[in-house]
């Protein structure tokens, strides 16, 4: 299927045509193909990648705020010293709360423009959450997933990261980020942005693969925030 993307390697693989094991696809790619055929969901294997990338792009100004004391001690630092800690939020609470409130009120075009502008003006700058040359961090993919979540859900997720500290919750995020495209909207600069009317997150489990504590945490978090999430068992 031409809509499949995956960043995985060295994993158990499946044949996409007859459901038998082969060297054709990982379990995540198998699942992507399944959701495409069954429900017309398009998507990416973006485990622990997509959400931190959107978090970083949308909060870039606050992350690199040089008014916070002692967090930048070298011009070679790629991120502030407290970035992964709970103190990151504590040290910038007022500015972060203001930015989250602003994002939460975004219209679709405002969300697109924010992600797009940061992505294109900061492209190439070393940081811990966006690998510019990796296709999973493709600008159009990140924008589509951002649209699929919508501003309010993104802010709810970001608040969880900020209050918990990224270090403690940066793993365990679902494997698949899926969305449905309902036709095409007008051409906007480089891309056609489809009307996206739903999002689904999926944790993929093969035989004998069990949920980790962080995976359970994120599944519970998404459920509590009204985000469609499920576990897919592949045998």
Where is each model-derived feature located?
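Conserved catalytic cores of phosphodiester-cleaving nucleases, focusing on short active-site segments
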Residues: 54, 138-161, 175-208, 214
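Short, charged, amphipathic alpha-helix that recurs within catalytic cores of restriction-modification
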Residues: 214-223
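Generic preference for hydrophobic/aromatic residues in regular secondary structure cores
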Residues: 43, 112-113, 188, 194, ...
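Nucleic-acid nuclease catalytic cores
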Residues: 180, 197-201, 225-235
């Amino acid at each position: 299927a031409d809509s499949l993307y995956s960043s995985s390697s060295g994993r158990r693989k499946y044949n996409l045509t007859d459901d038998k094991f082969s060297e054709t696809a990982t379990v995540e790619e198998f699942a992507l193909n399944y959701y495409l055929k069954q429900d017309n969901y398009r998507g990416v294997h973006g485990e622990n990648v997509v959400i931190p990338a959107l978090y970083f792009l949308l909060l870039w100004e606050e992350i690199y705020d040089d008014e916070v004391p002692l967090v930048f001690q070298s011009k070679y630092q790629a991120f502030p010293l407290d970035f992964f800690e709970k103190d990151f939020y504590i040290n910038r609470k007022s500015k972060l709360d203001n930015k989250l409130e602003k994002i939460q009120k975004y219209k679709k075009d405002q969300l697109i423009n924010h992600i797009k502008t940061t992505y294109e003006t900061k492209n190439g700058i070393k940081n811990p959450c966006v690998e510019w040359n990796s296709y999973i961090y493709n600008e159009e993919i990140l924008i589509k997933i951002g649209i699929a979540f919508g501003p309010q859900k993104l802010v709810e997720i970001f608040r969880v990261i900020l209050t918990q500290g990224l270090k403690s919750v940066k793993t365990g995020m679902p494997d698949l980020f899926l969305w449905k495209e309902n036709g095409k909207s007008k051409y906007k600069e480089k891309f056609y942005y489809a009307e996206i009317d739903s999002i689904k997150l999926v944790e993929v489990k093969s035989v004998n693969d069990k949920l980790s504590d962080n995976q359970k945490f994120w599944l519970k978090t998404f459920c509590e925030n009204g985000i469609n999430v499920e576990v897919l068992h592949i045998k």
